[in-house]
């Protein structure tokens, strides 16, 4: 079964598949309109992020090291 979703900008039907280059948008135009709306802060995340735990420098360093080990496409700055 093929999944079809409405374009968030114009509501045109978009087939959700790997070959749909601009998904969930129907076109580059709709994708850029949406990006512009985010840049102008017409769209925003409505709630502040709640942080339950304060991370120490050591914890942040360990998380960064683990991330870099698992994501080989990132290069550490020299």
Swiss-Prot record:
CC cofactor: Zn(2+)
Ligand binding (Zn(2+)): 7, 10, 26, 30
Keyword Transcription regulation: no
Keywords: Metal-binding, Zinc
Subunit structure: Interacts with GyrB.
Family stated for the protein in its record: Belongs to the DNA gyrase inhibitor YacG family.
NCBIfam families according to UniProt: PRK00418.1 (NF001638)
Name of this protein: DNA gyrase inhibitor YacG
Protein source organism: Colwellia psychrerythraea (strain 34H / ATCC BAA-681)
Taxonomy of the source species: Bacteria, Pseudomonadati, Pseudomonadota, Gammaproteobacteria, Alteromonadales
Name of the gene this protein is made from: yacG
